[in-house]
Amino acid sequence: MPAYKSSIFDLLNKDNLAIPDYQRPYKWTKRNIEDLLTDISKAIEEGQKFGESYKYRIGTILIHNSQDGNLYIVDGQQRIISIALVCLYLLPSFHSDLTDHYFSDDVSKQNIRDNYMFIRQWFTLQSDDEKKRFLDALKDIIEV
């Protein structure tokens, strides 16, 4: 599959985005989430400085376009799940097959709960305008 760039929001909205069974559990901690949110904040500042053509590459996501029609995340699972949690908080109507994914591993379940709670707490300290800037950045600035 050829390489291409996409906004993170567009990628997360793909109906067939999936995590293969062989992937390791979701292990990102609050510290990783804090670093991610800080990176996005810096990208927002840069976007305000350089204008609407500015894009920030949040990292590489490797996806396998499977014969069964699914887009399996091969690399970048931790980052993309974390960003999906941010989207879910900022936009409660947000739907992604990824956020509907059933995680059977107890470590994954606990880290997802803990990280969502951290995201919620982090954003309670932010203004509504800042929350909107974050959501806009995920749609327009942040790409993979």
Task: Give each language-model segment a name.
Residues 1-144:
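Glycine- and hydrophobic-rich flexible loops that cap the catalytic core of alpha/beta enzyme folds
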